[in-house]
Amino acid sequence: MKSLLSTLVIIMFLAHLVTGGWYVKKCANTLGNCRKMCRDGEKQTEPATSKCPIGKLCCVLDFKISGHCGGGGQNSDNLVTAGGDEGSSAKASTAAMVGAAAMAGTPTKTSAPAKTSAPAKTSTTTKASNAAKASTTTKASNAAKASAATMAGNTTKVSTAAIASTPAQASTPTKANST
């Protein structure tokens, strides 16, 4: 029984020795094997990254080198460049959104106000007695006078100077209810 087991161990040892399972040094980030000559379907990598002993080459399979080193359809440098371009455009669009939100949140005077016949009244409390009054987010008295902040979904109060419907009303102060 012992001789059968020892014979099996010797055969397994020789099989691994011949196939190179135990004594093959890995190279190119464990993608390739160090050999004297590369086989069919393998390519030699650069000597600087091989880590093979003198006189041996680092051989990596074609499909592994194309995905790892960029030898396939796309170059790895192009992938990095494309990612950098996307990041800069994303940063630019984010900055534009932040700038637009900051502008929409601050009350500004209108140079060309909307002309309506309704009076420019504002109130601190929301009264739902008139259907022409704006929603509670802007607290404006007329829906036509709502600013761009309301259209964007911003919930800031709109100043009376920004809601004035005519230039004459913009120059005169408007009355506010204090109830």
From Swiss-Prot:
Regions of biased composition (Low complexity) lie at 105-150
**What Gene Ontology cellular-component terms does the record carry?**
acrosomal vesicle; cell surface; extracellular region; sperm glycocalyx
Keyword hit for Zinc:
no
Q: Which UniProt keywords apply?
A: Cytoplasmic vesicle, Disulfide bond, Glycoprotein, Secreted, Signal
Q: Where in the cell is it found?
A: Cytoplasmic vesicle, Secretory vesicle, Acrosome; Secreted, Extracellular space
| Changes after translation | O-glycosylated; glycans contain alpha(2,3)-linked sialic acids.
Q: Which GO terms describe its biological process?
A: innate immune response
**Residues covered by region (Disordered):** 105-152
Which first-to-last residue range defines the signal peptide?
A: 1-20
Q: Which cysteines are joined by disulfide bonds?
A: 27-58, 34-52, 38-59
Q: In which tissues is it expressed?
A: Specifically expressed in corpus epididymis and cauda epididymis with expression in corpus being highest (at protein level). Not detected in other tissues tested, including testis, prostate, seminal vesicle and vas deferens (at protein level).
Q: Which family does it belong to?
A: Belongs to the beta-defensin family.
Q: What is the role of the protein in this entry?
A: Probable component of sperm glycocalyx. Likely protects and facilitates transport of sperm in the female reproductive tract. Probably released from the sperm surface during capacitation.
Q: What is this protein called?
A: Beta-defensin 22
Question: What high-level taxonomic lineage is stated for the organism?
Answer: Eukaryota, Metazoa, Chordata, Craniata, Vertebrata
